[in-house]
């Protein structure tokens, strides 16, 4: 089948991967000081970090609108057998709901809820590209992707809780205590929601190495074809610690390093279980 794959910009795939697999993105809206920007097009993560570091308020995001999805689908639906769009998890945004409403007007368009974000969603997007050439039907392809969404593991390790405080997800007192105790919370996406699963203590580079070991070592059920290291601006020693730990415990055929987009400000390792 000739299947076009599109996705929300939250998948955090690199420009090289987007070009390699002919993936087209639907940008979410980033709102900074009352002005709207297109994620990854008219604003970059570095601009957001610089804005907050200078004392600015935390930026917010808005879902892709029904009209924007309709415009995207109309560009490709007439020139392919089918189109599959993979959204950020429905527990994080209204994108899935809006995409489904837009897809109702296109008989050959399907929408898949990744139940994830960042390159956790990106895994599902790349699987859609891998499977599209061998798919017997559009619905069959989507069923395979929906089964996969429960097997993608996405987690990340926070260095500081400043952004969590600004976003109202953590109290100032709790953040102060965590910073004083040098605690680094590990947050995992489970069943389409984020939750703290463990706390590490010590220098960030050391915590990152232990975190990767815990995620990968002694895990025979992991698929070893692809892993993402997804990060925000970081000290070289921290990224080196992650690379070394992934090399030691991962043994993945492909390891992609990607910068987190405007929606995610964290370090992540993301992979798939069998």
What kind of feature is each model-predicted range?
Residues 1, 59-60, 86, 160, ...:
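Short, contiguous strand/loop micro-motifs
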Residues 1-5, 81:
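Short active-site oxyanion
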Residues 4, 10-24, 28-29, 35, ...:
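Mixed-charge interfacial surface used for oligomerization/domain docking
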Residues 35-105:
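Class I S-adenosyl-L-methionine
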Residues 63, 114-115:
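Short beta->alpha junction loops
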